[in-house]
C-alpha cells in the first residue's frame, strides 16, 4: 500500500504509508499524547487499516491484539480522541498521536494509563508554576549574585 498518508488525511502530500515500519504482525506502536498538556495518555497498536481510519475520521482507531479487531477509542465509552497531529519517530517504527480528548484515556477512568509509578527520582522535582514562583520569590528575598531574576524584581 503506497497510498500517500496526507492524501488520506486530505492535506498536502509528503509521506507514504510504505515508509512506516510495521512489525512482523503488521502493527506499529502509537503513543497517544494530550495536544495541550503534552502528557502521555496511553499506548496502543495500529495496523495500516486503523491508521487509515484514524486519518480519514481524524479520531483514534487502534488494533486490539487481544480481540484481534479494530476499535475506535470512545466508541462505547464516549471518550473520543480527536487527532491534531501524528508524528513518526526517526526510525519510522513508532508513532506519536497528539489528540484533543473528550474524557479520560484509561479504561479505569484515569486521565492517563500511566499512573503506576515504577521509579521516581526524589532529587528531581516535577515542574510547576508554583515552584517557579517560589524560586523567583526566594531570589527576591535572598538575592543570588549573577541571577537574571534580580534584573526585573
Language-model features: where?
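Short, compositionally biased leader-like segments
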Residues: 1-11
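C-terminal binding/interaction regions
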Residues: 9-17, 27, 41, 46-147
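Short, flexible loop/turn motifs enriched in small residues
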Residues: 23-25
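Short, acidic, Ser/Thr-enriched surface-loop or helix-capping motifs
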Residues: 32-35
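Carbohydrate-associated surface elements
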Residues: 38
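Conserved small/polar residues in nucleotide/adenosyl-binding loops
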Residues: 151-153
Amino acid at each position: 500500500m503506497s497510498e500517500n498518508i496526507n492524501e488520506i488525511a486530505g492535506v498536502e502530500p509528503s509521506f507514504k504509508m510504505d515508509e512506516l515500519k510495521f512489525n512482523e504482525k503488521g502493527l506499529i506502536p502509537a503513543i497517544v499524547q494530550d495536544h495541550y498538556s503534552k502528557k502521555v495518555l496511553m499506548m496502543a497498536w495500529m495496523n495500516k487499516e486503523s491508521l487509515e481510519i484514524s486519518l480519514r475520521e481524524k479520531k483514534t482507531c487502534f488494533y486490539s491484539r487481544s480481540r484481534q479487531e479494530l476499535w475506535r477509542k470512545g466508541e462505547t465509552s464516549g471518550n473520543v480522541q480527536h487527532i491534531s497531529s501524528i508524528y513518526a519517530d526517526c526510525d519510522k517504527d513508532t508513532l506519536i498521536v497528539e489528540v484533543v480528548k473528550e474524557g479520560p484515556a484509561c479504561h479505569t477512568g484515569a486521565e492517563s494509563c500511566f499512573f503506576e509509578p515504577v521509579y521516581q527520582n526524589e532529587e528531581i522535582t516535577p515542574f510547576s508554576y508554583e515552584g517557579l514562583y517560589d524560586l523567583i520569590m526566594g531570589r527576591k528575598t535572598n538575592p543570588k549574585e549573577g541571577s537574571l531574576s534580580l534584573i526585573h524584581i
